[in-house]
From Swiss-Prot:
Statement: the UniProt record of this protein carries the keyword Cytoplasm: yes
Lineage start: Bacteria, Bacillati, Cyanobacteriota, Cyanophyceae, Oscillatoriophycideae
Gene Ontology annotations of biological process type: regulation of translational termination
Family stated for the protein in its record: Belongs to the TRAFAC class translation factor GTPase superfamily. Classic translation factor GTPase family. PrfC subfamily.
Name of the protein described by the UniProt record: Peptide chain release factor 3
Gene name as annotated: prfC
Pfam families per the UniProt record, alphabetical: EF-G_D2 (PF22042), GTP_EFTU (PF00009), RF3_C (PF16658)
Keywords on record: Cytoplasm, GTP-binding, Nucleotide-binding, Protein biosynthesis
């Protein structure tokens, strides 16, 4: 029996790939996501990137505010099949104010796709998210986008990635021309040239002509200067580049690089097929009992995201669970590591942005949606068999703080419910004054847009108009020794002492100088910019 289960698990794991896309805003993430869905048959026509009135809304941007602004501000899950491989694409927020949501999503991913604008190269948000991938040793696949527009020289971009990120590089394909003269790519795997036909906004799969580099007919398709430039570039690549080493790719030391244009579909299919060959299958994860392999027959998984009101008609709450080991089955009863209780997992769902369908089973690498009536927290482990807990997902230091006020006392219950649910799902961090007379919660954010989203959702989902009252602090540090350490430190000048959502002490500082002064005055006070995890074991 055990052997049968393990064979079933092994087959399921071999047929799955799981990844998240990281990029700076406006690098074309939503467009690339939709083109991958187009090739996977999950959608039949790509949605409009800018959500113009006469075109479709982008498939992965489902929240009302996202549709209004044309930006992604939450992470979603998009599942599709391509050539008998099930792909779980963990779509991440496109706005830099929501990098913490992206971090949580990366905790559930086995691979990352780094999307770069060919004209701009590496940008600040991409660098930040790369550091998170590096910490987790995630394999990183690079897609250089927007080759159909004027951009930097490809060799210059390779050099920047290698020098600034410290990655070894391997160009899997190479662009032929840039901007208006972008004709297609040379695929180093098949040693063939793929020339693309331009279609309106790339709403259908790209049509292409495939010819060998030495084909005498090449002059019919390619201008002479582009042909000679390609040959020269390929010679340089052979001289300067290392061979593709999948061990180095899988450990995050080498990045395979692809060139193309998501808007026009140039190079997207070549990227997808190579990615499926090179990417890691679902992998083992660190836990309280060591590294747990996906083939372990007992079910386990962890919650990496909560989302309230995904369906406005039902006012539901969904927990996103990454399946880590074993086979998930509908209506199974599992252990909830944080509370020690047992939970029946009824009504599991397969997620596709705002669309959902009931599922009967799921395997390692899959993401399922579970109905969450206040049971789960981010980082929670659920399991069967021997007790285990996966690494939790920490919160990072916010930089903006503001009281959130409810001017209408008759909306008190709705206000409390909204704050609780939005905090649980990680839309924003919440803190409270240690002064019992101050009841207003303190919102703590990475960027201003998080405040706007909370106010928007409080009104649209809970019917509560709110008012912000900013605080003049810009840094938060958690106190390692808890309230006892605060007591022993005595009076701490020029700070505000608050408690976070788990009741732990946090010090707020006006600036870096203020923080350094407190460190000098209280050398025994251990401060950290990353919160201890509320659920799960502390990441190593």
């Amino acid at each position: 029996m055990t052997t049968e289960i393990q064979l079933e698990l092994e087959q399921a794991v071999n047929q799955r790939r799981n990844f998240a896309i990281i990029s700076h805003p406006d690098a074309g993430k939503t467009t690339l996501t939709e083109k991958l869905l187009l090739y996977g048959g999950a959608i039949h026509q790509a949605g409009a990137v800018k959500a113009r009135r006469d075109q479709r809304k982008a498939t992965s941007d489902w929240m009302e505010m996202e549709k209004q602004r044309g930006i992604s501000i939450t992470s979603t899950v998009l599942q599709f099949d391509y050539k008998n491989i099930q792909i779980n694409l963990l779509d991440t927020p496109g706005h830099q104010d929501f990098s913490e949501d992206t971090y949580r999503t990366l905790a559930a991913a086995d691979n990352a796709v780094m999307l770069i604008d060919a004209a701009k190269g590496l940008e600040p948000q991409t660098r930040k998210l790369f550091e998170v991938c590096k910490l987790r040793a995630l394999p990183i696949f690079t897609f250089v986008n927007k080759l159909d527009r004027p951009g930097r020289e490809p060799l210059e971009l390779l050099d920047e990635i290698e020098q600034e990120l410290g990655l070894q590089i391997y160009a899997v394909n190479w662009p032929i021309g840039i901007g208006d003269r972008f004709k297609g790519v040379y695929d180093r795997r098949s040693k063939a040239i793929h020339l693309f036909e331009r279609r309106a906004h790339g709403s259908q799969e790209a049509q292409e002509t495939v010819i060998q580099l030495g084909d005498p007919k090449i002059e019919e398709y390619l201008e002479q200067d582009l042909y000679y430039q390609l040959k020269e570039d390929l010679e340089i690549l052979e001289e300067i580049g290392a061979d593709l080493d999948l061990e180095k790719v899988h450990s995050g030391q080498m990045t395979p690089i692809f060139f193309g244009s998501a808007m026009t579909n140039f190079g997207v299919k070549l990227f997808l097929e190579a990615f499926l060959d090179y990417a890691l299958k679902p992998i083992g994860r660190n836990s309280s009992v060591g590294l747990v392999d996906p083939s372990y027959p007992e079910f386990s998984g962890f919650v990496f995201k909560l989302q309230a009101n995904m369906d406005p008609k039902h006012r539901d709450r969904v927990a996103f669970v990454r399946v880590c080991t074993g086979k998930f089955e509908k209506d199974m009863t599992v252990n909830h590591a944080r509370t020690g209780k047992t939970v029946r997992l009824s009504r599991p769902q397969k997620l596709f942005a705002q669309d959902r369908a009931s599922i009967e089973e799921a395997y390692p690498g899959d993401v399922i949606g579970l109905n969450n009536p206040g049971v789960f927290a981010i980082g929670d482990t659920i399991y069967n068999g021997k007790k285990l807990e996966y690494e939790g997902i920490p919160c990072f230091s916010p930089e903006l703080f503001s009281y959130l006020k409810n001017p209408n006392p008759s909306k008190f219950k709705q206000f409390q419910k909204g704050i609780q649910e939005l905090t649980e799902e990680g839309a924003i961090q919440i803190m409270f004054s240690t002064d019992d007379f101050i009841r207003d919660p303190i919102l703590a954010a990475v960027g201003q847009l998080q405040f706007e989203v909370v106010q928007f959702r409080m009104l649209s989902e809970y019917g509560v108009e709110t008012r912000l009252e900013p605080l003049s602090y810009s840094l938060a540090r958690w106190v390692a020794g808890g309230w006892k350490a605060i007591e022993e430190a005595g009076r701490i000048f020029n700070t505000m002492t608050v408690k976070d959502g788990w009741g732990r002490p946090v010090l707020l500082f006006k600036n870096e100088w203020n923080l350094q002064q407190v460190k000098e005055d209280h050398p025994k006070l251990e401060l950290t910019s990353i919160a201890p995890v509320g659920s799960g074991i502390q990441p190593s």
